[in-house]
A protein has these predicted regions:
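Conserved catalytic-core motifs of GNAT/GCN5-like acyltransferases
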Residues: 31, 51-56, 119, 145-147
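Vicinal oxygen chelate
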Residues: 27-35, 62-65, 81-106, 126-131
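Conserved active-site tyrosine of GNAT-family acetyltransferases
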Residues: 40-45, 107, 132-135
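Conserved short beta-strand elements that form part of the metal-binding/catalytic scaffold
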Residues: 51-86, 137-142
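Conserved acetyl-CoA-binding loop of GNAT-fold acetyltransferases
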Residues: 46-53, 109-112
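Short, ordered coil/turn segments that flank beta-strands lining enzyme active or ligand-binding pockets
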Residues: 69, 110, 133
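Short acidic/glycine-enriched loop/turn segments that link adjacent beta-strands
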Residues: 57-60, 121-126
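N-terminal beta-strand motif that seeds the catalytic metal site of vicinal oxygen chelate
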Residues: 3, 7-41, 88-92, 143-147
Length: 147
């Protein structure tokens, strides 16, 4: 057992690894609040280089993708039952510092809303931040601790 705060303990799963196969998760699909799904999708497609896979504002939800990154854009009526009001921030993990810089230049050239330029941070990430039309933030980064 591993002790946690206030005497709470969890079992030592390392001993059971020979018999338990951990479930592998696919990449998460963030839900991005949008005041208008069609306008938001237009920005993600025309400015940020995503593809509209399905949906529209009438249905309240749209799926977009770029490579292995998938996002859902949702309007207020779609979200009202559980209160995801936004804006939110999500992280986009790239494969190298060069990719971070390349994407920054691509988005800057396309007139994306850039919040901060690429910079090596003390926490060992190279990152920049962009925003969408509803001020949701996209933190683009590369973890260079082991590089």
């Amino acid at each position: 057992m591993f002790p946690l705060a206030r005497g709470i303990q969890i079992p030592n799963l390392a001993m059971a690894r020979d018999t338990i196969s951990p479930m592998m998760f696919p990449p998460p699909v963030p839900e991005i609040p949008a005041s208008d799904v069609d306008k938001a999708a237009g920005y993600y497609v025309n400015t940020l280089g995503f593809t509209l896979d399905w949906g529209d504002d009438q249905g309240g939800i749209a799926g977009i993708s770029r490579g292995n990154c998938r996002l859902c854009l949702t309007n207020r009526s779609f979200r009202e039952s559980y209160g995801n009001v936004g804006p939110i921030l999500f992280w986009l993990n790239l494969e190298s510092k060069a990719e971070v810089d390349e994407l920054f230049l691509e988005w800057k050239t396309a007139n994306a809303k850039i919040v901060s330029e690429p910079e090596d941070k003390p926490w060992m990430l190279r990152e920049f931040v962009a925003a969408d039309l509803d001020d949701n933030l996209i933190r683009v980064f590369y973890d260079f601790r082991g590089a």
